[in-house]
Amino acid sequence: MKFFISFAFLCLVLSCVAALSPDQVESRLKSYVENRSFALLRSGRVARAGTNTVQCYDKYVPLIRQAAAEGKFASDKCAQEGQNAREEETKKSEVIRESLNVKVASIEKGLGACVAKYDVLEYFTCLRDHASESQTAAGEVGKTSAVIVEGLNIVLTNIELREKYCIDQAFEQAQEKSDILFTELENCLIEGLPEPEPEPEPEPEPEPEPEPEPEPEPEPEPEPEPEPEPEPEPEPEPEPEPEPEPEPEPEPEPEPEPEPEPEPEPEPEPEPEPEPEPEPEPEPEPEPEPEPEPEPEPEPEPEPEPQPEPESKPNSLFNF
């Protein structure tokens, strides 16, 4: 029974590996899985294992097949990337190829015209005329082709190296994963399946806090009514300009007072007896000057009245 189960396991693994591509990964994975499978079947420890081998195969065979499928997928991806890179480089060279085809066609056309000449002289004359042009065009075609060949060789070689490195990485990852799974399978066949660890009870999710009720939005305050625009005050009427006051008429100048006429001297009378000399009359006080009025001319001062001459004394009694 154990042998039958082991043989079925080997067939399943080999059938999975046989479908891998590209060829390098397929052959390398196939060789690796065969060696590990036969080594597992020849192990004495596995032959003395208990009755729980079916459970071990049920657990690890799908995992080994999955590892092989992942290696196949990775190798296919590497090969596809390499193919895409080669096609891209080929498309780049197509433009140069078309330009070279034009030059080659011109050479063929010229030489073909010479071949069609029946006359020998015309034939060689045509070859002579087209030889220089053909050599120049052929030289350009040869130089360009040499550069393209050298560049493509380098690019394609690099693409191939990258593809090989990618496939090697895919194989190594699949090999490492398969190696780990084979080791776990061997331990399972010898020691049995480990008891499953109790799954930790999921922590109760904290009850969501009640969302606070949204505060009511404050009612918008009513917009204040626009105040009525104040009526424009009437413009004050312009005050009438005051009439100019009439200029005061100039007061008439006072007429000058007439000067008093001098009194006539009295005729000498016969000298009487000498009488006592009369006392001289006091001189009349000068009249006060009137106060000057505004802007009138000053009045002339009155001349003082002449004083009466004293009566002369008679020199003698007989003065006629």
UniProtKB/Swiss-Prot annotation:
The keyword Signal applies. Residues 192-320 are annotated as: Disordered. Keywords: Repeat, Secreted, Signal. It is found in: Secreted. Residues 194-311 are annotated as: 59 X 2 AA tandem repeats of P-E. Residues 1-19 form the signal peptide. GO terms for cellular component: extracellular region. Residues 194-308 have a biased composition (Acidic residues). Expressed in the gut, but not salivary glands, of female and male flies (at protein level). Present in vesicles in midgut cells and in the lumen of the gut. Coiled coil: none annotated. InterPro entries: SDr-like (IPR050972), TsetseEP (IPR007931). PANTHER family: OS05G0225800 PROTEIN (PTHR34403:SF14), TOL-PAL SYSTEM PROTEIN TOLA (PTHR34403). This is Protein TsetseEP. It comes from Glossina morsitans morsitans. The lineage of its organism: Eukaryota, Metazoa, Ecdysozoa, Arthropoda, Hexapoda.
